[in-house]
Design a protein with these regions (language model features):
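Bilayer-spanning, highly hydrophobic alpha-helical transmembrane segments
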Residues: 89-99, 319-346, 355-364, 370-376, ...
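Actuator/coupling domain of P-type ATPases
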Residues: 54-75, 79, 108, 112-115, ...
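Conserved ATP-binding TGD loop and adjacent catalytic N/P-domain core of P-type ATPases
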Residues: 2-4, 21, 34, 436, ...
């Protein structure tokens, strides 16, 4: 026994939810296993604990199922569907003549023998898999969907063979062959639909290019992306995808990051900016250095998060799992009671066998097993496309119950980083990119050029603001950062100071004419910086945290959904009330420490509310952990926030609104699926037992019941967020 770890293994041979439930329970009862989840829809088991992988493999194989180890190439849903289609075609070609002979009473010399030969071929060629799996299940004291199919088709076939040998009438070869044919057709559609449900992960991984242009020994070489090493220099031309995560070291461009954030507008990138594998370089030639490769890239991490979420179980699935665990046994009991009841009612065995077979083949535990996981698969995949990463199915499920949403201010409602908000010259005139002050000084050009070498957040905010105005910067001389106060530089032979009032005072610079504006800016809880040129004060700059463009609309939409919005912030009351009023938030609490936020959330929960919390995942970690559902506002570089149930990659409250919509619609789909799955079986079994359904019709109904569940789940792919 080693340390606790997670093991994910792909399982082959599962035919229904009963199989998955049996494997899950057996592994879960193994010493050293703390949790076992087997997902029938994804064909994967996720095991948490200290039990060795080889022991888990032996348990699965001991139950009669196969495993796909890491060194074995995984079989895709597309390949499985292709195999099922071939089996169906063979079965259909052989079954049509049998059906025609029986239904249209076509009699010729060897008509009965023809039915025997064709049906035998169907049973022992395309249909042999059902019987092999059923035999394995019986040998391991387990029965599943394949057991029901084999028992139903086998009973009809066996009875017909015995009747033919005895020279009697009333053959049911067509029932046996058509049952196999329709089930194979249903399996084909089901597999194809399940493949579509799991397309999100494949689409994500397909985003990464196969090749990369690496600069080695001064020469550009095209190599497989798997050969790229950390620290290597890469070239990316316009229209090409970024191969791995890294930083731009030369050039500038616009990057389409929609696959990460869901944001359609390209993002401007220049030297020093981070770029991520799978995103698209839309305009300029850039050179970058590789920083994260393989499984360490953002793209790979997102794919892993989505895969983990799709493999988890929603709480609502527990009832379906319990029913699935005993479903097949109950169906066999009902079939035996049906057979006995018809015989006791005075019918012959050859008449009583038909409703019994219909009961066996119409039952559908698959629909029960697929009702929840397929909706979760499609829902989490659709969320990832929109830049919403959901940790597990339980989070997706609980989010639809949220009726109170708590927001932090800084970094959630606001951008969380300094921006230039005010710029006034000595004459109280607002400076713009197009105007100079009365002395002919280009204020923007001065402050941008002088601050371009600053590593302080305020200096970088000033440079960002100036560059946004489209102004080119020039080099300055004798740049010096003055700790805690600002910077000094020589611009066109003039001495420039940018910084605090303390810096101005120490250099005997009079800022009295700017004091009023400075106080107005300070009253808005913003930081101020003065500009002095040749010992004369010229401007005051206001730097603050600005509200995100989408925050107000998002909060309004959340309110319209019937969810109360509460703002909890550590900022002072004046700032908090101002932002709250601007955003239309009625309930605002200010001057709160992290522990205070937790207490506020607990108080809301005690009133019976389900609380969601949106924060930046760092200072708000305690509050995020206290909430029923936590949303982490982040960027592509912060998606590993373990504290959050849901990560909003774009860093936008609007994504939280979309997550709530998706959660509600996913739960609606799950409820519809479960209603259909339970309702179908509750109604179908007695109808079949009473003799109202031919086994062939029963087989068709069963085959398409699971298909309907998966197809309903696929509607989430078209959900507009």
């Amino acid at each position: 026994m080693g340390k606790t770890k997670n093991l994910t293994v792909e399982i082959t041979g599962m035919s229904c939810a009963s199989c998955a439930k049996r494997i899950e329970d057996t592994i879960g009862n193994t010493n050293g296993v703390s949790e076992s989840i087997v997902n029938f829809a994804t064909r994967k088991a996720t095991v948490t604990g200290r039990a060795p992988a080889e022991e888990i493999y032996k348990i699965i194989e001991g139950l009669g199922y196969g495993i796909v180890k890491e060194e074995t190439p995984a079989v895709s849903e597309r390949e499985i569907a292709k195999s099922e289609w071939k089996k169906f075609l063979v079965s259909a070609i052989l079954s049509v003549p049998v059906f025609a002979i029986s239904m249209f009473m076509i009699h010729f010399r060897f008509s009965d023998l023809t039915q025997l030969v064709l049906t035998t071929t169907v049973i022992f060629w395309p249909g042999i898999g059902f019987f092999k799996n059923a035999l394995k299940q019986v040998m391991h004291w387990s029965i599943g969907m394949d057991s029901l199919i084999a028992l139903g088709a086998g009973t009809a076939y066996g009875f017909s063979v015995i009747t033919l040998i005895k020279g009697g009438s009333g053959l049911y070869f067509e029932s046996a062959s058509i049952i196999i044919t329709l089930i194979l057709l249903g399996r084909f559609f089901e597999t194809k639909a399940k493949g579509k449900a799991g397309e999100a992960i494949r689409k994500l991984m397909d985003l990464q290019p196969k090749m990369a242009r690496v600069i080695r020994d001064g020469t550009e070489k095209e190599v497989p992306v798997t050969d790229v090493q950390v620290g290597e220099r890469l070239a990316i031309r316009p229209g090409e995808k970024i191969p791995v995560d890294g930083a731009i070291i030369e050039g500038w461009t616009s990057i389409d990051e929609s696959m990460l954030t869901g944001e359609s507008m390209p993002i401007h990138k220049e030297e020093g900016d981070k770029v991520f594998g799978g995103t698209v370089n839309t305009t300029g030639l850039i050179y970058m250095t590789a920083e994260n490769i393989g499984a360490n890239t953002v793209l790979a991490h997102i794919a892993k998060l989505v895969e983990d979420a799709q493999g988890s179980k929603a709480l609502v699935q527990r009832l379906a799992d319990k029913v699935s665990g005993v479903f097949v046994q109950i169906v066999i009991l009902i079939a035996l009671l049906t057979l006995g009841g018809w015989i006791l009612a005075g019918y012959q065995f050859n008449e009583a066998i038909i409703p019994a077979v219909a009961v066996l083949v119409i039952a559908c535990p698959c629909a029960l097993g697929l009702a929840t996981p397929t909706a979760v698969m499609v829902g989490t995949g659709r969320a990832a496309e929109a830049g919403i990463l959901i940790k597990d199915a339980a989070s997706l499920e609980l989010a639809h119950k949220i009726n109170t949403l708590v927001l932090d201010k800084t970094g959630t409602i606001t951008e969380g980083k300094p921006r230039v908000t005010d710029l006034f010259n000595i004459n109280d005139e607002k400076e713009t990119a197009e105007t100079d002050n009365k002395n002919g000084l280009d204020i923007l050009h001065i402050i941008g050029s002088c601050e371009q070498h600053s590593e302080h957040p305020i200096g970088m905010a000033i440079v960002h603001y100036v560059r946004e105005q489209g102004i080119d910067l020039e080099e300055v001389k004798d740049f010096k950062a003055i700790a805690g106060m600002g910077i000094r530089a020589i611009y066109n032979e003039s001495t420039v100071l940018i910084g605090s009032d303390k810096l101005m005072t120490e250099n005997n610079i009079d800022v009295s004419e700017l004091k009023q504006k400075a106080m107005e800016i300070k009253d808005e809880s913003k930081t101020i910086a003065f500009l002095a040129v040749d010992n004369k004060a010229e401007s005051v700059i206001g730097i603050g945290d600005v509200v995100r463009e989408t925050s107000k609309d998002a909060i309004q939409e959340i309110n319209d959904m019937g969810v109360e919005v509460v703002m909890l912030t550590g900022d002072n009351e004046v700032v908090a009330e101002t932002v709250g009023k601007e955003m239309g938030i009625v309930s605002v609490k200010s001057n709160l420490r992290p522990a205070d936020k937790c207490d506020e959330i607990k108080e809301i929960q005690q009133s019976g509310k389900i609380v969601g919390m949106i924060g930046d995942g760092i200072n708000d970690a305690p509050a995020l952990a206290t909430a029923d559902v936590s949303f982490a506002i982040g960027t592509a570089t912060e998606i590993a926030m373990e504290a959050a149930n849901i990560t909003l990659v774009k860093g936008d409250i609007l994504r939280a609104c979309e997550a709530l919509k998706l959660s509600r619609q996913t739960m609606n789909i799950i409820k519809q699926n479960l209603f259909w799955a339970f309702g179908y079986n509750v109604l179908a079994l007695p109808v079949a037992a009473l003799g109202f359904l031919n086994p062939m019709i029963a087989a068709g109904a069963m085959a398409f019941s699971s298909v309907s569940v998966v197809t309903n789940s696929l509607r989430l792919r078209r959900l507009r967020l």
